């Protein structure tokens, strides 16, 4: 049988999702826990192979097993064996032709960026940071040039193993709440470091180093060396994976960090002002 899981994790303590020799990965931790429950070796496949330091709010994985266990064992049992920074949220049996990676039609990533002179304390490792002020309107204008199907060679890493750089970016929304910026990227698939490389360029534009039209130049040149440096992984989250309705997977409502950020920020500001009266 084939089982599908949805999990969330804090990526700070790992070399990334994928197993690597002599390094700790999210995949290796999950496979170890599931193998103990099944009393046999389990290998998992993920929808997205997140990099070191990148988090997931809704990672989808599948695995095959001949062992019969209640679905609760794959959730509660796994969570009892996993470290605190990885949590299985949901499990279900799925048809044998389902594939967590290749059946996915769309992936969504969120990036949370703090823009202020002082580095983050409470949100250290959970949000990116720049000490520069950013122009939201300029970044939004630049983002519109990226929507659609393009050759994203200027925004792929040198280590990217994809056969070509053609990707379709469906949505790139940028919003601001106080000192926090939220970037939402949605595409059929992403190249290695694509989100963080685009983010680096948008931040340069927000700082005023380049005009929004610079994005068009980068797309046309297809040269990674002309673009901005790869930005920090700290604020990047795999937030959702979409599948065709025939797989009968649920629409999973994740806890969006900006809601938590806004709640904490609102409480902090109200307490500070109350103390000054």
From Swiss-Prot:
Q: Which UniProt keywords apply?
A: Isomerase, tRNA processing
Active-site residue list: 51
One Gene Ontology term of the molecular function aspect: tRNA pseudouridine(38-40) synthase activity
Q: Name one Pfam family in it.
A: PseudoU_synth_1
Give the superkingdom in one word. Bacteria
Cite the binding residues for substrate: 109
**CDD domains to which the protein is assigned, alphabetical:** PseudoU_synth_EcTruA
What does it catalyze? uridine(38/39/40) in tRNA = pseudouridine(38/39/40) in tRNA
* tRNA processing keyword on record: yes
**InterPro entries reported in the protein's UniProt record:** PsdUridine_synth_cat_dom_sf, PsdUridine_synth_TruA, PsdUridine_synth_TruA_a/b_dom, PsdUridine_synth_TruA_C, TruA/RsuA/RluB/E/F_N
Q: What class of enzyme is it?
A: isomerase
Name a biological process GO annotation. tRNA pseudouridine synthesis
Q: What is its EC number?
A: 5.4.99.12
Q: Which Gene3D superfamilies match?
A: Pseudouridine synthase I, catalytic domain, C-terminal subdomain (3.30.70.660), Pseudouridine synthase I, catalytic domain, N-terminal subdomain (3.30.70.580)
Task: Reply yes or no: does the keyword Isomerase apply.
Answer: yes
NCBIfam families found in the cross-reference section: hisT_truA
Q: How does it assemble?
A: Homodimer.
Biological role:
Formation of pseudouridine at positions 38, 39 and 40 in the anticodon stem and loop of transfer RNAs.
Give the similarity note.
Belongs to the tRNA pseudouridine synthase TruA family.
Q: What is this protein called?
A: tRNA pseudouridine synthase A
Q: Specify the taxonomic lineage.
A: Bacteria, Pseudomonadati, Pseudomonadota, Betaproteobacteria, Nitrosomonadales
Q: Which gene encodes it?
A: truA
